[in-house]
Amino acid sequence: MDKLSEFCSKFVENVMKMTVNQLNKVTKELAKKITIDSNFKSVTDNNSVIESSKEITENKVIEKLEFNIILESFISSQRIKLIKTLRDLISIGLKEAKDLIETLPKTIYEGVSKEFAEETKKTLEESGASVIITENII
């Protein structure tokens, strides 16, 4: 597959994952940036494209793409281990890590992928933390 075909294929996959609101925003942004000759005839009119995308979106189970990781509490006997883990995970200093665990609950990450959120949760739980993953409202 050539690069253009691969790009188009990935683009279509990403578009299929979008909600109707996201598609509407993309359409408006494209309309602002692209000038199309008034003589250009579309294969389908805008309304049928919008209705088709609504049908696809409504029939498809949409999985949230972004998640937040919230550190709720920790086992006090594993405080030092958790501080070390936090310093490694979010690249903060010792004082910042200590301050963070003193003011729980705290959001550690916002808008991360599901896989990253699950891996991070596992790492934090191994360090004695109680962690919640919430959906990021898009």
Curated annotation (Swiss-Prot):
Entry GO MF terms: mRNA binding; structural constituent of ribosome
Main localization (coarse): plastid
Family affiliation: Belongs to the bacterial ribosomal protein bL12 family.
Biological processes per GO annotation: translation
Protein name, as recorded: Large ribosomal subunit protein bL12c
Subunit composition and interactions: Homodimer. Part of the ribosomal stalk of the 50S ribosomal subunit. Forms a multimeric L10(L12)X complex, where L10 forms an elongated spine to which 2 to 4 L12 dimers bind in a sequential fashion. Binds GTP-bound translation factors.
Alphabetized UniProt keyword annotations: Plastid, Ribonucleoprotein, Ribosomal protein
Gene (UniProt): rpl12
Organism: Euglena longa
